[in-house]
Amino acid sequence: MDEEIHKLWWVFPGFKIEKMITGLDLPVNLAFVKEPTSKPEDVLLYVTELYGNIKAITNDWKVHTYAENLLNYEPNYEFPGTGESGLTGLCIEPESGDLFVSMIYEEDGEMKNQLLRTKSKDGLKMHSKETIIKDIPSIKAAHQMQEISIGFDGKLYVNVGDGMIKPEVAQDDDDLRGKILRMNLDGSVPEDNPKKDSLIFAKGFRNPFGAIWRKSDESLYIADNGPAYDDRVARVQAGENYGWPESMRTNSIFWHNLSQGITALDFMQNEEFPYEFDDELFVAFFGGSYQKGPGIKGKNIIKMKLNKDGTAINSYDIFVKYTGENAASPCGIAFGPGGLYFTDLHGEKDGQMHKAAGNIYKISSVVKEEGEIIVPYTKENADRCICPGCPTINECMKNRNEHLFCARGKTDCEMEKKGCLCGECPIGSEYNLRGLLNREKGKKII
């Protein structure tokens, strides 16, 4: 465990943080390949860098330049301000491995949004690209085309900001700004879109940076930045109006009274963390665009527990928080092999604005300490437990000490009061758990 990194980032109890990559130039979003191989030289994930590069990272954590100089204008590194836009959204087409990326470009002195599809022969270097959609007005100061995702229906969903200058366009059905767009992979309009011959899936958004699909309800969730308040999370449904510019709370399931710079989000839904975190939502709060030190505004990752139908938040906890003194902030997040990964846009560069110092960090569960026997808290093990619905299941699966299987009298479990023999447990022999707890005698018998 790297003590220096833990001085910079506080993490939720039971987890650790590791720096996987450093020296990236303003890394924004990251996306993992669908089924990574075990070969060191094969691609594991891709990362967009704000000022026009895409990096491919292989299983051995070497960094390769997949594409570079995709912007046709010179960015100015102004944070906050006109340096906040560029190349942001990233999505991998699972069958072909092609990348969809969103960015702004300059044409006749005006900034516009475009969506590109890039192709590669080996996954390490782009060999061709095509424009899927373009000509959507934008500016250099954020509120551009942001995250891209592919739904369970195989369609492409694209977050488009309102362009900042005229927020009323978010309500204009003839303008693609301030919308979530739905399209076929070639950019054409699906026949079953809410409005015939229109790419608009939902409207009323301001600066919808992040997007993720939840398996349990097969719905799209987005993160949308408010003006100086009401940064929100919303479950996006076909044909709905999400209120902006009149309100950021319309059809939202969560909003923050103060602006937190909400960016990316992802659900824990593939057993990257212990089962107790299943279906929880993890949201990056970036904070100020170049804010030094911990601050009270953002610079953390929040975990939220949603209700089953995605209409409300049942719990809210800080999961990761920056505690250093520089401008580091979490930006993109994604679950991948063995944990949650996030990009740190600025890193620890202490005011050197042009220095490539961005990082990728990994948060993983501390499953086992030396000398400790642990029963992994997975859905499979929980389903095999001798006491379905046991109130001590979390303790049984998480806190294994001295060969004891049970939670040692911390609740009113009747089996514990009697002394629960691990030999009776259907998973006990698998993990060599042989102890029993005899509460009456107050001693352990092996």
Language-model-detected regions and their locations in the chain:
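Beta-propeller domain segments
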Residues: 2-11, 36-40, 48, 74-80, ...
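Predominantly a core beta-strand signature of beta-propeller blades
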Residues: 16-18, 61-64, 127-130, 156, ...
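Beta-strand-rich domains and repeat architectures in extracellular enzymes and scaffolds
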Residues: 19-52
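Beta-propeller domains
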Residues: 40-70
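Short loop/turn motifs that cap or connect beta-strands within the blades
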Residues: 67-71, 131-137, 318-323
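Asp-box/WD-like beta-propeller blade repeats and closely related beta-sheet repeat scaffolds
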Residues: 111-150
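Cysteine-centered metal-binding/redox modules
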Residues: 369-446
